[in-house]
């Protein structure tokens, strides 16, 4: 993973975070009731459920750009950067691939002072430090109420990544005004356009109006008289340590309702979220130096950055007297095209002089402001989970870095209070005045509600929820997306061990291990993380002896999960009375369920499969010689169909995870998009259940990703009336693949044990004369770049002295399939990997299905 920034990767057909609008009922789009009315299965599921929570009403609508529109939007930028030769595949979530350009131009000044030449940082943007927080459109994890400054739009950016996440600006385009989250944005009336309505949303009550006009400017003639550049009203690029350049405007201290700026400092208001920051004048440059500081990676990735660019250039356009033609209904991207060309061309004809403020013009954007103190910034940090990582492209073009950091916006909030609390905790524990188990290891709060699974210490409610959601989220390079200790962090150090996927944030190292530890770690190469080192204790960071068991317990014994009645237990059937099994498989994929049943020797009387992918159907039909009966799209299956095909003894399925996975920036949640397909499984499951008085054994199983929102997980559990178990395929295969499984299969929560035939190491899966460079690989997804491993994106295999990717037959063995299982209908390598990336791990399903041998006839 080399480049100026690195973006979150998808974990399972989903990708990168952008602007998610589902807000647990607090903010939804304003589309019509008819449009947002749930499908009959959803209505049935909701009506069947006695409790209808606000989460069920979250809505989000989105639109997508065509490839042609995306290409036209980015062509001029590629020309200026001189790149575009190498493109990464970007999955828009609908099965189409979009080619996005990579940036080889080095983003200026993206390194922090603390970095050594051997260390490359990966920045993600979205927020800044301290003042630079965006309000999260989703309120979860028991955080404090949402109070945020609502001013001129801005969000702190990330610098450019050469390896793009699966979802980019192309796949997550600017939504229609009715559905875009503008909770922190109000467009000045003077710069509004008829084509794109960027006015404030309806969630801006109780805000003050801040207007600074020419009179206030004249009255501040003595402000900023320190022989430094930039006065009130100047349009600038600002730089905060750890983040890339972001557009802003110099304002008077009176506009901030704070104190006067210190000598050599300037108050600036960031475009995008309207926050104010006091920043050194030496870290400001004129907006006229546009090409040197414009960040193509962030523009392609972040809606907030495009919004900031729009308002910045609209302000510049007004000052320069520049006009652009537009047509009604024109998208934001279309309006930005000529604006960006104008900016990259030097703001001709007026040039930089035309951008200077006119004393007759307002010098602060006429935007509504909601005041809040730092305590109310807490929920804001979660908005941009699309955390971008930045690296230095020029170095990347020469050779892979020996060591990299990744920097993200998730920890960009003001963590001052948390760090002070953790410092006190560390001091007390060091002086034997406190117990780690009595404090939250992530934030330092007292009276934790749960234990930390890896290290001695606890977790408070909000940190535990965050841990549940994000611990199994991985980036494109295979590393965890967030810190192993706190599941956030702004700057993350990556373990150098090839088989390790852990990363640790600078904050945790400095507070828990010791001051200066992070700087020392940056200079070490290789650097082994605290999960790999043989020594367990480092400062107050003490690895648990039984961390592997604790980790399993953490995801299966959630104290906040609703207690359900234990599933009905069926006594084992005597061998003489067992009969072949009858199966209904929804979202069947490549017939993993049928394959496992046959491997276990269970006789299958009928296997009815619902699948819409033609390639998957081809695999199942050819490899199982027509023994599988394929039926309609799951949405078209009726109760009458179930009665005709049934009865069934086993119902299995795993609905698409695109709109549930946290790694998807455009995810729509459980109640929209593909997320609502869960309810198709739910209502068909109810149709297949035995009638009252029928005591025949009946089993079912539902699967989905671990990296989903806690509320979605709870809703699924509530409808299915049971809690899930979490199983990671790493225990029985050569690849990570953590999944939740709901169901009533006997012994679902028993320990996972590998069989003698399971291929536990990569070398066991390779063809002759090929050598594995590591024992295990990270989660293999539908993306081709998920094959490369580690922070340097290394090829996992060596053959004849040359590095190589995994072959399709080797991928099949990793998943537990027979070699050439997907080799049908002339499918290419990419298509075969996509089928495998969406499939189940055969050893895991074998582990779950094995108890069925006590109930059904075997061969």
Curated annotation (Swiss-Prot):
Domain spans labelled SAM-dependent MTase C5-type: 581-859
Enzyme class (EC, first level): transferase
Active site positions, chain numbering: 657
Activity regulation description: Activated by binding to the regulatory factor DNMT3L.
Coiled coil residues, start to end: none
Post-translational modification: Sumoylated.
Biased composition (Acidic residues): 85-94
Residues recorded with modification Phosphothreonine: 112
Residues bearing PTM Phosphoserine: 96, 116, 216
Superkingdom field: Eukaryota
UniProt: S-adenosyl-L-methionine binding residues: 588-592, 611, 633-635, 838-840
Effect of residue 824 to M: Significantly reduces activity
This protein's GO CC annotations: chromosome, centromeric region; heterochromatin; nucleoplasm; nucleus
Chain spans, region Interaction with DNMT1 and DNMT3A: 1-305
Zinc fingers, GATA-type class: 439-469
Region ranges (Disordered): 25-226, 348-429
Catalytic reactions of this protein: a 2'-deoxycytidine in DNA + S-adenosyl-L-methionine = a 5-methyl-2'-deoxycytidine in DNA + S-adenosyl-L-homocysteine + H(+)
Compositional bias of kind Low complexity: 167-179
Region (Interaction with the PRC2/EED-EZH2 complex): 440-532
Subunit structure: Interacts with CBX4, DNMT1, DNMT3A, SETDB1, UBE2I9, UBL1 and ZHX1. Interacts with SUV39H1 and BAZ2A/TIP5. Interacts with the PRC2/EED-EZH2 complex. Interacts with UHRF1.
Protein family membership: Belongs to the class I-like SAM-binding methyltransferase superfamily. C5-methyltransferase family.
The record's note on its domains: The PWWP domain is essential for targeting to pericentric heterochromatin.
Role: Required for genome-wide de novo methylation and is essential for the establishment of DNA methylation patterns during development. DNA methylation is coordinated with methylation of histones. May preferentially methylates nucleosomal DNA within the nucleosome core region. May function as transcriptional co-repressor by associating with CBX4 and independently of DNA methylation. Seems to be involved in gene silencing.
Protein name per its UniProtKB record: DNA (cytosine-5)-methyltransferase 3B
Lineage, broadest ranks: Eukaryota, Metazoa, Chordata, Craniata, Vertebrata
């Amino acid at each position: 993973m080399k480049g100026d920034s690195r973006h979150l990767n998808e974990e399972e057909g989903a990708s990168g975070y952008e602007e998610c609008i589902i807000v647990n009922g607090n903010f939804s789009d304003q589309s019509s009731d008819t449009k947002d009315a749930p499908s009959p299965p959803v209505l049935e599921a909701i009506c069947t459920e006695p409790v209808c929570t606000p989460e069920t009403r979250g809505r989000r609508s989105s639109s997508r750009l065509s490839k042609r529109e995306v290409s036209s939007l980015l062509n001029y930028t590629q020309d200026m950067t001189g790149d575009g030769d190498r493109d990464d595949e970007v999955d828009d979530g609908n099965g189409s691939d979009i080619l996005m350009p990579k940036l080889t131009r080095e983003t200026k000044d993206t390194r922090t002072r603390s970095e050594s030449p051997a260390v490359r940082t990966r920045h993600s943007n979205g927020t800044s430090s301290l003042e630079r927080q965006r309000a999260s459109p989703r309120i979860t994890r028991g955080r404090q109420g949402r109070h945020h400054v609502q001013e001129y739009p801005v969000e702190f950016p990330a610098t450019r990544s050469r390896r793009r996440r699966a979802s980019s600006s192309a796949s997550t385009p600017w939504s229609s005004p009715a559905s875009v989250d503008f909770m922190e944005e109000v467009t000045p009336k003077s710069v509004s356009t008829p084509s794109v309505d960027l006015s404030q949303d309806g969630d801006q009550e109780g805000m003050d109006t801040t207007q600074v006009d020419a009179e206030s400017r004249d009255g501040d003639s003595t402000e900023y008289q320190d022989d430094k550049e930039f006065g009130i009203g100047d349009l600038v690029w600002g730089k905060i340590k750890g983040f890339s350049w972001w557009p802003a405007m110099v304002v008077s201290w009176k506009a901030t309702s704070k104190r006067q700026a210190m000598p050599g400092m300037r108050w600036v208001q960031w475009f995008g979220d309207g926050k104010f920051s006091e920043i050194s004048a030496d870290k400001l440059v004129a907006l006229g130096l546009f090409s040197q500081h414009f960040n193509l990676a962030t523009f392609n990735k972040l809606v907030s950055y495009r919004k900031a660019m729009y308002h910045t250039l609209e302000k510049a356009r007004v000052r320069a007297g520049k006009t652009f033609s537009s047509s009604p209904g024109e998208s934001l991207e279309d309006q930005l095209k000529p604006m960006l060309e104008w900016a990259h061309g030097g703001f001709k004809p007026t040039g930089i002089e035309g951008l200077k403020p006119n004393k007759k013009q307002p010098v602060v954007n006429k935007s509504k402001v909601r005041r809040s103190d730092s305590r109310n910034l807490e929920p804001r940090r979660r908005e941009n989970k699309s955390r971008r990582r930045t690296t230095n492209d020029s170095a990347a073009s020469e050779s892979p870095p020996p060591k990299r950091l990744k920097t993200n916006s998730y920890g960009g909030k003001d963590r001052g209070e948390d760090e002070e609390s953790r410092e006190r905790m560390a001091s007390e524990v060091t002086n034997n005045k406190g117990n780690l188990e009595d404090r939250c290891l992530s934030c330092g709060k007292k009276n934790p509600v749960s234990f930390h699974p890896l290290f001695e210490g606890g977790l408070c409610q909000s940190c535990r929820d965050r841990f549940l959601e994000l611990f199994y989220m991985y980036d494109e390079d295979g590393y965890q997306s967030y810190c192993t200790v706190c599941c956030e962090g702004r700057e993350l150090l990556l373990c150098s061990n090839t088989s390790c996927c852990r990363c640790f944030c600078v904050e945790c190292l400095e507070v828990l291990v010791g001051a200066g530890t992070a700087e020392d770690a940056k200079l070490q190469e290789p650097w082994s993380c605290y999960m790999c080192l043989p020594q367990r204790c480092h400062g107050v960071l003490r690895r648990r002896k039984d961390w592997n068991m604790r980790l399993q317990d953490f995801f299966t014994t959630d104290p906040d999960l609703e207690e359900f009645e234990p599933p009905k237990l069926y006594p084992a059937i005597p061998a003489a009375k067992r009969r072949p099994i009858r199966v209904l498989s929804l979202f069947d994929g490549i017939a993993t369920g049928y394959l496992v049943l046959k491997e276990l020797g269970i006789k299958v009387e009928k296997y009815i499969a619902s699948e819409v992918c033609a390639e998957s159907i081809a695999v199942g039909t050819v490899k199982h010689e027509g023994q599988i009966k394929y039926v309609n799209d799951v949405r078209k299956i009726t109760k009458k169909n179930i009665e005709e095909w049934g009865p069934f003894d086993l119902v299995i399925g795993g609905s698409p995870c695109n709109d549930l996975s946290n790694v998807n920036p455009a995810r729509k949640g459980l109640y929209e998009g593909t997320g609502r397909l869960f309810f198709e499984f739910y209502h068909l499951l109810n149709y297949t259940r035995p009638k009252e008085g029928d005591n025949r054994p009946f089993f079912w199983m539902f699967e989905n990703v671990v990296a989903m929102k806690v509320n979605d997980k709870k809703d699924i559990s509530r409808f299915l009336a049971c809690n899930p178990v979490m199983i990671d395929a790493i225990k029985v295969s050569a690849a990570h693949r953590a999944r939740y499984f709901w169901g009533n299969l006997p012994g679902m929560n028993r320990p996972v044990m590998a069989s003698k035939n399971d291929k536990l190491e990569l070398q066991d899966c390779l063809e002759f004369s090929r050598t594995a460079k590591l024992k295990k690989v990270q989660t293999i997804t539908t993306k081709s770049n998920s094959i490369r491993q580690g922070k340097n994106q290394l090829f996992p295999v060596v053959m004849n002295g040359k590095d190589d990717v995994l072959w399709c037959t080797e991928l099949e063995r990793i998943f537990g399939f027979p070699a050439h299982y997907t080799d049908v209908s002339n499918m290419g390598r990419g298509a075969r990997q996509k089928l495998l990336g969406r499939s189940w791990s055969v050893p895991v399903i074998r582990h779950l299905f094995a108890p069925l041998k006590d109930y059904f006839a075997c061969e």
